[in-house]
């Protein structure tokens, strides 16, 4: 056990000639903060220190909690988010007033959208200068965090700190979970506890409204609830009577550690399932009834069973779903746009236990031949889809003319090789952060996971740059749990530009991380081919490729890959290995070697030069087609015209007069005849 600071060591205090408090603040607000974190089982705090918060940051360290110090506050919260998701424990992050809390805003928003329980401890200014904007680093984060946290509270009095923080841990961990922020300003930190003697007639005790270990031995555990018995009976009967049901496992299958119960339910009922985000491998994706995505005959489903799933944008708001049994951790996760036969609300593990017991008690585990036939049909669909995906990926491998003759890779081929290597070396137990936007579309159907909380994303925040911090937080969480299986952060070059310098933290702690960068030279540069032209011709002339502006030739909205060498980060951070991969035939072995290095000695940046022609299929799909609806038809490249003709023909009646123009395949590179005119530089080809 680490040596404690003397303020936490009563035996050592008795040896002092001059009692604590005569020459320093004692007891301090920082002491109270640290004691609550220890009581709640916190072992690590993630942050960037600063003058306004040294009082409590130092105390957190002096009580024996490890400080993980970063260069930028955004990465501290991303790391805390991943750590919490991997360990299923609340995480603590901190940042100073002003720039510190401001930098934490985006990741706090992401944590709110991913329902991650983070306790954020922030600095604050003196109250007497509120809204004058003439003191140093003025901000009131309890105000600007208010709509992206479950609770944001400004604290003024030392004697109220313990009860507020204790409540904060409960609120953060109550479903739907989410971050809580506490602003501990200098008024609170610089105040002596004895001030309460002059407050409200001295009626307040040292720790008002606080009870130590308030739930006794269960203080650090989440409070669990169960579903109504009558709802369980109704749901079990409906599930038994369904002929072609399908399950979607969401995040709370992982959060509630419900793997055994959900797997038993699947085995009892013989219902095929797919998995989403953090819920991927809530039941192993090697289970015989797992189906990646939906089968082609999804219109035949007669019941949908979402378990702990946020049903929203990426699910089409349940459009086309049949009658459903919703299993949710809280009322807020019961969706009113879903045709619902029964709703079961409670801790996922507990509810699934209830449901399994009811199924066995009523003989609902004796499934019909029709259900067995349905299961077999879905198994066959999965096998065929896997075979088709494999064949499609290998089409764009080393034997494809474009990838044989050029020094860059196809995202789809890389996705298949990642799947194969992860399975060969680690039985598909590699955790992965999905960061690069283009790669996210290609790789998601290919990835296979065998342990819960393996697929880390930006959730509905849909940002980039989170993968750097997430990899660090997840790796530390795994090390705490005794695993050194490498973590794979699938970064894009934009995400690396955003957050890459904090890779130094991974280097300092020799963390087993492979930062695989799909480097295509910009913010989705492939979008120019369907929407802007090869030279970014639909932008203003000052932004087109090769135009001179202030004496400098322009690159549109991209940059040549030879100008950004992420492998060269190894020259900045000693202990980091940097590798370039630009040949398909080398990718498999280079990935294996990267894993080997990461596992044995520390992080690797694998800078993969990829085909800039390729786009996430969403770029030529309905939503992006709307986003580009302002561009004049006559100026659109061929692929953009095809997308607009296919998607918006009802909105723009003139489009219906044109011949059918099917949407292009996003896996296919641009052909020479599609350019319409010559690119001004060769690297755009």
Regions found by a protein language model. Name each.
Residues 2-25, 196, 207-218, 222, ...:
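Phosphate/pyrophosphate-binding active-site segments
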Residues 50-51, 73-75, 136-137, 330, ...:
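Short glycine-enriched loops at secondary-structure junctions
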Residues 101, 162-163, 251-257, 407-412, ...:
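Active-site glycine- and acidic-residue-rich loops that bind
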Residues 30-34, 38-40, 48-58, 379-481:
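Active-site diphosphate/adenylate-binding microenvironment
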Residues 2-365, 421, 484, 512-515, ...:
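N-terminal alpha/beta PP-like core and its mobile active-site loop of ThDP/TPP-dependent enzymes
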């Amino acid at each position: 056990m680490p040596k404690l600071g003397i303020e936490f060591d009563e035996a050592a205090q008795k040896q002092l000639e001059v009692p604590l408090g005569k020459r320093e603040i004692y007891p301090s607000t920082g002491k109270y903060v640290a004691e609550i974190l220890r009581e709640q089982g916190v072992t690590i705090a993630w942050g960037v220190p600063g003058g306004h918060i040294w009082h409590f940051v130092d105390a957190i360290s002096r009580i024996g909690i490890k400080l993980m110090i970063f260069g930028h506050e955004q990465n501290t919260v991303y790391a805390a988010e991943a750590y919490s998701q991997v360990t299923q424990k609340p995480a603590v992050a901190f940042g100073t007033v002003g720039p510190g809390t401001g930098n934490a805003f985006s990741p706090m928003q992401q944590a709110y959208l991913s329902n991650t329980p983070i306790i954020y401890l922030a600095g604050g200014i003196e109250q007497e200068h509120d809204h004058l904007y003439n003191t140093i680093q003025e901000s009131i984060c309890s105000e600007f965090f208010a709509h992206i946290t479950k609770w944001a509270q400004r604290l003024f009095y030392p004697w109220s700190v313990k009860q507020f923080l204790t409540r904060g841990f409960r609120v953060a961990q109550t479903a739907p979970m989410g971050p809580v922020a506490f602003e501990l300003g200098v008024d609170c930190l610089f105040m002596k506890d004895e001030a309460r003697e002059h407050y409200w007639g001295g009626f307040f005790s040292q720790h008002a409204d606080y009870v130590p270990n308030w739930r006794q031995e269960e203080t650090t555990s989440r409070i669990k609830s169960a579903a109504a018995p009558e709802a369980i009976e109704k749901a079990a009967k409906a599930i038994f009577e369904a002929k072609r049901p399908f399950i979607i496992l969401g995040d709370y299958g992982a959060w509630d550690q419900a793997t055994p119960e959900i797997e038993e339910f699947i085995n009892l009922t013989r219902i095929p399932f797919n998995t989403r985000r953090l819920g991927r491998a809530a039941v192993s994706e090697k289970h015989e009834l797992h189906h990646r995505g939906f089968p082609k005959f999804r219109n035949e489903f007669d019941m949908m069973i979402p378990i702990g799933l946020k049903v929203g944008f990426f699910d089409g708001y349940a459009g086309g779903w049949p009658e459903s049994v919703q299993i949710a951790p809280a009322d807020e996760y019961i969706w009113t746009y879903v045709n619902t036969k029964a709703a079961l609300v409670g801790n996922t593990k507990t509810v699934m236990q209830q449901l399994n017991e009811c199924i066995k008690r009523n003989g609902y585990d004796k499934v019909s031949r029709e259900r067995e036939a349905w299961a077999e049909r879905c198994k066959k669909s999965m096998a065929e889809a896997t075979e088709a995906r494999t064949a499609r990926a290998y089409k764009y491998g080393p034997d494809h003319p474009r990838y044989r003759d050029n020094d860059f890779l196809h995202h789809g081929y890389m996705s298949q090789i990642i799947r194969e290597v992860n399975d060969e070396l680690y039985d598909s137990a590699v955790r992965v952060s999905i960061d690069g936007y283009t790669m996210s579309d290609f790789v998601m159907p290919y990835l296979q996971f065998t342990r819960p909380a393996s697929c880390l994303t930006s959730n509905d925040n849909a940002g980039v740059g989170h993968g750097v911090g997430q990899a660090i937080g997840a790796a530390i969480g795994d090390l705490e749990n005794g695993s050194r299986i490498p973590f794979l952060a699938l970064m894009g070059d934009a995400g690396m530009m955003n957050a890459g310098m904090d890779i130094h933290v991974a280097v300092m702690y020799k963390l087993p991380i492979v930062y695989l960068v799909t480097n295509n030279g910009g913010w989705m540069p492939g979008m120019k081919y369907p929407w802007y032209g090869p030279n970014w011709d639909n932008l203003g002339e000052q932004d087109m490729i090769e135009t001179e502006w202030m004496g400098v030739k322009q690159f549109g909205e991209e940059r040549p890959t030879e100008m950004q060498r992420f492998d060269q980060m190894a020259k900045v951070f000693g202990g980091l290995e940097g590798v370039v991969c630009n040949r398909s035939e080398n990718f498999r072995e280079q990935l294996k070697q990267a894993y080997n290095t990461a596992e044995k000695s520390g992080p690797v940046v694998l800078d993969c030069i990829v085909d800039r022609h390729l786009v996430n299929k969403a770029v030529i799909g309905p939503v992006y087609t709307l986003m580009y609806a302002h561009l004049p038809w006559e100026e659109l490249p061929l692929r953009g015209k095809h997308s607009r003709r296919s998607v918006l023909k009802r909105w723009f009646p003139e489009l219906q007069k044109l011949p059918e123009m099917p949407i292009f395949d996003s896996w296919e590179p641009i052909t020479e005849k599609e350019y319409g005119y010559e690119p001004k530089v060769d690297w755009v080809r």
